């Protein structure tokens, strides 16, 4: 049975359970055209109210899926690319956010520009590929 794409996935880190999911948003222009595509990874500590939104917005030299030639969850720059559907990528983003001071038990929603964490995730992705 396939996993539901809408349901949050579990990620256990140092004995703590986090839930994470991936979403896509954009602004519809009409006629089947869209702009301002954005991928958002949402991470939260299990049973906590606060959430972390890691947002990857489209921009110069920043690739975000727009429905044409890029698969869902793929984001990239000249530095590399990552698949936001992969648990290893979610873990790398979580680790980078924690290193920047995100507090998982904070009851507020915090938004972080995903591109500030991208380098750490891309390096981890490259290292994992090299060890395969």
Language-model features, listed with the residues they occupy:
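Short, isolated positions in well-ordered beta-strands
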Residues: 13, 18-20
